[in-house]
Amino acid sequence: PIDQLERAKGSNRAEIFYAIVPDPKAAYSCAHSEADAVRQVQGTFLHEMQHLISFNEHVLARGGAAEDTWLNEGLSHVAEELGSRYFESRYPAPFGRSTPTQLYPDSAGPFIGPLLLNAYLYLNSSLQHSVTAYDGTGSIEERGATWLFLRWLADQKGDDITRRLVQTSRTGIANVEAASGERFSSLFGDFSLALFADSLPGVARNAIPPRLRFGNRSLRLIMAREAVVSGFFDPFPLATFAAPPGDILRSSMPPGTMIHAIIPGDPSAGPVRLSFSTSELTPFASLLGAQMSIMRLPP
């Protein structure tokens, strides 16, 4: 981004996108065939172009601060998905696929493949990785978390919300709230439920409120396919815990994480009381923003 600031010392007053080039004989770096370079650069170009656009809109055009890392990276991964969506529309099933079981055409692979892997790894460790608080520039699990959140958000509010998130001087959670017209706590709570409720086994998909599922992508279906492609054993790795009445569930939860628990019981048996506390058995401080979302499962 410094190249975009003409007043910066040492600036060449140009916008440059740096990428790898084919080097099959490893003359200047590790070996990169032409096919490898093309495959890797496609999604990376869309990803980095979003960063350039975001910096221009936030800093240069509006004089604000650069977008928060978690949201900036999440939007760049959404930009990668645009490449997949282009080829998905160009090659509807079963066209453009090496095998009839493929969910996506071959040409979409370089764009959607890494996103699905990131998402799977996040779901496999959702208690350890935050949606909104990155460790540095973000692990692949954290990036998977933010992509899933923004994908769900766009399904709820329309794809144009990504434009509103970029064309503004707002950043972070305040940006999400302004663009969506909702409190972040409400969005995060329903997103947490959607991760579990989307395409719930044994329940018709349209029996789940649209707010508690993704749009036309079945999360469990695409994660099950990702498990096959990447050699994982669990078709849907999101952990759920049993919390029968009278039981205690303990867990460490960094900011921006969630835990999913199923409370079995007979509705005719009367109400169930839930109590939450810190590890010291004291109430949560209000600044922590601890919250609970409840979904009654169909019988």
Show which residues each predicted segment covers:
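Juxtacatalytic substrate-recognition/specificity segment
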Residues: 1-68, 75, 79, 83-98
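Hydrophobic transmembrane alpha-helix bundles
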Residues: 2-24, 97-104, 164, 195-222
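Generic preference for hydrophobic/aromatic residues in regular secondary structure cores
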Residues: 3-4, 10-20, 25-28, 117-123, ...
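Generic structural hydrophobic/aromatic packing signal, biased to beta-strands
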Residues: 19, 47, 76, 150, ...
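Stable alpha-helical elements in mature extracytoplasmic
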Residues: 37, 41, 45-49, 71-75, ...
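Structured segments of extracytoplasmic/periplasmic soluble domains
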Residues: 52-56, 79-86, 152-160, 164, ...
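Acidic/His/Gly-enriched intrinsically disordered linker/tail segments
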Residues: 64-146, 173-198
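Beta/coil-rich, acidic/histidine-enriched accessory regions frequently appended to metallopeptidases
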Residues: 171-299
